[in-house]
Regions:
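His/Asp/Glu-rich metal-coordinating catalytic cores
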Residues: 1-66, 71-283, 301-315, 334-338
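Hard-cation-handling environments
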Residues: 195-325, 329-331, 335-354, 358-378, ...
Length: 523
């Protein structure tokens, strides 16, 4: 019998760009195709996508792409992937809407996007995929039970055990019990909060925190969050309505997502609650709320531009209250802290987690993670979704509840894991890493050496020297033009510029004149 191979292409050993390959014989199932934010020293990089070179040459083996939910770290690389690969995509209704918002029309025409629902059974080659409902910070999130020829694999997706969710749909504990009855070969489980003791609070707690903010604020309220957090957008809209405030939406992605979610029925918002950014200037500040993108402080986002005063129609003024309703993604701390300081400098009152409970995590903490393992009792365990420290901590939790150490595999992306009906073993690590996206440039155009050059330019600046030189006479025609950027002010550099001119002249004196003139022949 063939081995089953699990090939993580992203999301293990890092936060973001989640992508998993499940392979049996000449059949491939893909789970999620996400992106991640760049680190602060990756100058000019918009975002990072998985390296899926492993799949090139295997396009005809891909039986389907199954998406667990609509956050960008799970769907953000799909537009790039589907430009190159044609395979059917399966997603829940809201997730499908979020995918289509980001796909070019020609890709949508070429690729079939199928709507699935918890309880469905997808037969994709030798794989029988059973999506089941889990709670997360976005509606329509699923985990996956995957029947394979060697056994049942359970992929948790991003999850937590929220028994009082804002959408009224608790996790499907009965399905988890059913998986236990059938026997689970391996559990692949979300590790994001594996270092957090206890259990993650319910999303409902966020409503009371927002009510406190709205009750105390006398001026405008600006709430920044991820554009895909549909449940959170609903909560803020409800609170704003209860406090007599109109809501304006700022940020292209949030405008598109709100429109789509309203059309699909995932946002229940009366038409008279939403106003345009232009209309808020005619309203008293105490009657205005603004929902915006940029909770991670991205320079080109709404919050990034508001913090630096570069937004065309909005300004942060004294008396405004700004709420950052999100967790700071690892690597973004410096950027977020800079934005918070800039907003304070402009006179705003800034409310942010963890100083105020205006954000609730969508990921399971330690007691929930142990509960999932105890319910499923898998033979083997692979922690997924997180930095290596998160994966190792999750593996330690699995040992606490009885999973033998030799039955766990805490590995980073690229490590192949092989399964038979009663064994798991690590294989080789395939080459791969980050694929950088900078505007329309993707991949090889932005190599690590390019990023090193950008870092060096940022650290040391650049100097340009231009001159006209008579090659026949061996003489400068006029003074060299020397310009600098990012080195020091012109006043400080004036003496150095004169010295640089002398260096140029001395260097050119060592070049012998050319006695034979260049000839351009007419043909």
């Amino acid at each position: 019998m063939e081995n089953l191979r699990i090939v993580p292409l992203g999301g293990l050993g890092e936060v973001g760009k989640n992508m998993m390959v499940v392979e049996y014989g000449r059949n491939i199932l893909i789970i999620d195709v996400g992106m991640m934010f760049p680190e602060s020293d990756m100058y000019g990089v918009d975002y990072i996508i998985p390296d899926y070179d492993y799949l090139r040459g295997k396009e005809d083996r891909i039986r389907g792409i199954v998406i667990t939910h609509g956050h960008m770290d799970h769907i953000g690389a799909l537009p790039h992937f589907l430009q190159e690969f044609t395979a059917p995509v399966y997603a829940t209704r809201l997730t499908r809407g979020l995918i289509e918002v980001n796909l070019r029309r020609e890709v949508q025409k070429r690729v079939k996007i199928n709507t699935m629902a918890p309880g469905d059974v997808l037969r994709l080659g030798p794989f029988k995929v059973e999506p089941f409902h889990v709670c997360h910070s976005i509606p329509d999130t699923v985990g996956l039970g995957i029947e394979t020829p060697v056994g049942l694999i359970v992929h948790s997706g991003d999850f937590k055990f929220d028994h009082t969710p804002v959408d009224g749909w608790p996790p499907d504990m009965a399905k988890l019990a059913d998986f236990n009855r059938r026997g689970v070969l391996a559990l692949l489980s979300d590790s994001t909060n594996s270092g957090s003791p206890g259990a993650t609070p319910s999303e409902r707690l966020l409503t009371s925190a927002m009510e406190d903010v709205f009750r105390e604020a006398n001026g405008r309220i600006i709430v920044a969050t991820f554009a895909s957090l549909i449940s959170r957008i609903q909560q803020v809209m409800d609170v704003a309505s209860n406090f007599g405030r109109k809501v304006a939406i700022a940020g292209t992605s949030m405008v598109k997502n709100v429109k789509m979610a309203r059309e699909l029925g995932y946002l229940d918002v009366p038409d008279n609650l939403i106003v345009s950014l232009h209309e808020i200037h005619r309203l008293p500040p105490q009657e205005v709320a603004i929902m915006a993108t940029g909770s991670q402080g991205e320079p080109r986002s709404i919050m990034g531009r508001l913090a630096t005063g570069r937004h065309s129609s909005l300004r942060v003024v004294p008396g405004d209250t700004v709420v950052l309703s999100s967790h700071t993604i690892p690597g973004n701390e410096e950027t977020v802290h800079r934005v918070i300081n800039q907003l304070f400098q402009k006179g705003a009152n800034v409310v942010y987690h963890p100083l105020s409970p205006v954000h609730v995590s969508g990921h399971a903490s330690q007691e929930e993670l142990k509960t999932l393992i105890n319910i499923l009792r898998p033979q083997f365990f692979i922690p997924i979704h997180g930095e290596l420290r998160h994966l190792k901590q999750h593996a330690a939790l699995a040992h606490q509840v009885g999973i033998p150490e030799r039955h766990t595999a805490a590995v980073e992306h690229g490590h192949i894991i092989r399964f038979t009906e009663n064994s798991m073993e690590g294989g080789e690590r395939i080459p791969g890493g980050y694929v950088y996206v900078d505007g329309s440039w993707v991949g090889d155009a932005i190599s690590p050496s390019i990023l090193r050059d950008r870092n060096e330019l940022a650290a040391t600046g650049v100097c340009y020297i231009a001159f006209r030189y008579n090659q026949n006479q061996g003489q400068l025609i006029d003074h060299p033009v020397i310009q600098t950027r990012g080195i020091a002010s012109q006043e400080v550099l004036s003496d150095l510029v004169i010295e640089a001119e002398d260096i140029v002249r001395r260097a050119l004196k060592g070049i012998a004149p050319t006695t034979t003139p260049d000839v351009v022949e007419k043909t």
